[in-house]
Amino acid sequence: MQHVSSSQSSQRHVQWPGACPGAGEEQPACSQPSLPLTLPSPSHQLQQLMVRGGPAGGQNMNVDLQGVGPGLQGSPQVTLAPLPLPSPTSPGFQFSAQPRRFEHGSPSYIQVTSPLSQQVQTQSPTQPSPGPGQALQNVRAGAPGPGLGLCSSSPTGDFVDASVLVRQISLSPSSGGHFVFQDGSGLTQIAQGAQVQLQHPGTPITVRERRPSQPHTQSGGTIHHLGPQSPAAAGGAGLQPLASPSHITTANLPPQISSIIQGQLVQQQQVLQGPPLPRPLGFERTPGVLLPGAGGAAGFGMTSPPPPTSPSRTAVPPGLSSLPLTSVGNTGMKKVPKKLEEIPPASPEMAQMRKQCLDYHHQEMQALKEVFKEYLIELFFLQHFQGNMMDFLAFKERLYGPLQAYLRQNDLDIEEEEEEHFEVINDEVKVVARKHGQPGTPVAIATQLPPRTSAAFPAQQQPLQQIHMGTPVPGDVNSIKMEASKRQ
């Protein structure tokens, strides 16, 4: 039997549906559709209250719950007051019956969805309390202390149906006597951080609104921000991570809002994940961090391996590590020139084409040599004479001995000429004999010396020429070198 009394002293007796067949005189009262109260079996110790007809504006309504079940002790009273919400009795109000949804978010929490059009009265901090009103007592399994936690949180924090209130009742044994009411949709008009005391003969219950400072729709996270207790009772301790981090409950919302939530979640996952990487990234769940003014969402971090501190620690692919390292040292060695043999042409046409190609490349090479020679003359003029460029044309026309030696020294074909001259020197070996028939020292004499050698030893050419011409010399080659050094 339930007794419902309003402030206008109007009493209506409503009997439970299970007790209607037993009492014949109370059957007309059961058929009144004004205040149907439906509750599940008492073994659940959870009640769902659905009020279709609210009180008049500016009035409070007291509901006495008697004999509900072992979950409520005594006869507590619940005060329902009107809020600035669309009234269920208005013609524009549409109520959609939502099915009850029971989920296991964490081992110590039970989520109960009840379509309430009127919420539990939480008074504005600017209005005085009308007096000793409601008292919510021990709705916790088997513990004597008050441990009721009601949370109304929206997945997006902005969109929520006015007729849906998600209540999450904490069943943890640790309780601090706090009544935490989270609301991200603006259903409850309470200032930031404001506290409203609900008077009760027993332990006082504190109503506090916590608004999240940032949206909690993270990739891979969950929207059910459950904590073992309120931040004041927890003392800033880390919150337990939820058991199922891969889903977001949108079954209690209209399909339009749920599709918006899923679309935003997919976009955020794409932004956070980015393009597919060739190597896997390590995902780890960091312990819950309590943000100021937030509901304690479990952090979700994405860690990547730190950069190597030294080049030796850099990971080398196995294909590169097997390459031989000796090939780098072979590049510094001088390659032995190979003698190229001329391949006879297959036809006269091929011989003609080959000749034309050789002539063309020879002309290009001669043009490059002429340009290089011009640059060498200009460089010699600027380095040795340091003159004016106006005199450069006159300097280039006249023949200058050091300039010719400088050009021969920096000639592009000097290496080929040196090789040819050294071959000539090795071929010509002559024996110098003295007048008295004593054998002399064999000396290698060349008819033409390389330009570098002739420029480096200009004074030694005369003794060598005298030896070559057969003039008598009083000593051997060593004495000739000593005399040449004395003359210098």
Swiss-Prot record:
It comes from the Eukaryota. Residues 1-15, 31-43, 113-126, 226-245 have a biased composition (Low complexity). Pfam families: EP400_N. Residues 1-43, 66-100, 113-144, 201-250, 271-336 are annotated as: Disordered. This is Putative EP400-like protein. It comes from Homo sapiens. The lineage of its organism: Eukaryota, Metazoa, Chordata, Craniata, Vertebrata.
